[in-house]
Structures are given as C-alpha cells and as structure tokens.
C-alpha cells in the first residue's frame, strides 16, 4: 500500500515511523527542507518539499498512484484542502485529515442549522 503523509511534525513523524516499521511505502511531504532531510535519512523514504495542498506538490509525491493520504500538518484548513485537492487528482484515494478545531467538525455544525 502506498501512503502519503503530509506534514512532518510530531504527528506526521510518529505516523511515518509506525507505517514504515509496518512495511508501507511512504512518501512524506513538508514545507521544511531540513526536517525532510532528517526524515529521509532516518526512515529511508521518498520526500517531497512543498505545500501539500497544491496540485504540483501532490503530483510530485505520486498522488495518482497512492492508496491513502494522511494530512497531518498543524493547520486544520491545510489538512482539509490537502485532502480535497488530492481526492480531485485520484478519485480512488482514501483520505484522512485530523481536525482539532471543533467549529470545523461536521457533527458540531448540526447545532447551527
């Protein structure tokens, strides 16, 4: 299974460590070149420098041949946009975008309708 992890912070690094240990083919996207270099050496994975919410970056990461993308940046809005853009490029893609702001969670919006 090919997985893209977008964001190499605490959550993304933990996911990358666990998923590579389980034998998954991981590509890591982040906007910080130094963090990516460290992860590339530590985990021996493909990395892509750029904004995970952009079409060009996702295509460089191989989104069209990917089974799952996990958007794990520190910004909920970026995570959601990343998954929406990625799904537009690969309709068979599974997406995960953790959302920490309660006002962005779908089940919370019912009280506003």
Where are these regions (language model features)?
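Aromatic pocket-lining residues of Rossmann-like dinucleotide-binding sites
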Residues: 19
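Short alpha-helix immediately C-terminal to the canonical SAM-binding loop
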Residues: 36
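N-terminal Rossmann-fold NAD(P) dinucleotide-binding loop
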Residues: 12
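Conserved acidic E/D residue at the C-terminus of a beta-strand in Rossmann-like folds
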Residues: 30-31
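Glycine-rich Rossmann-fold phosphate-binding loop(s) that bind the pyrophosphate
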Residues: 8
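Conserved small/polar residues in nucleotide/adenosyl-binding loops
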Residues: 102-109
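Short beta-strand element of Class I
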Residues: 26
């Amino acid at each position: 299974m090919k997985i893209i992890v977008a964001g190499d912070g605490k959550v993304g690094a933990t996911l990358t460590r666990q998923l590579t240990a389980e034998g998954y083919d991981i590509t890591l996207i982040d906007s910080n070149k130094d963090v990516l270099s460290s992860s590339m050496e530590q985990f021996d994975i493909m990395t892509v420098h750029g904004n995970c919410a952009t079409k060009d970056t996702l295509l460089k990461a191989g989104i069209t041949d990917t089974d799952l993308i996990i958007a794990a940046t520190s910004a909920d809005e970026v995570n959601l946009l990343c998954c929406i853009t990625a799904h537009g490029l690969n309709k068979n893609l599974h997406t995960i975008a953790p959302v920490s702001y309660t006002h962005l969670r779908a089940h919370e919006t019912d009280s506003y309708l």
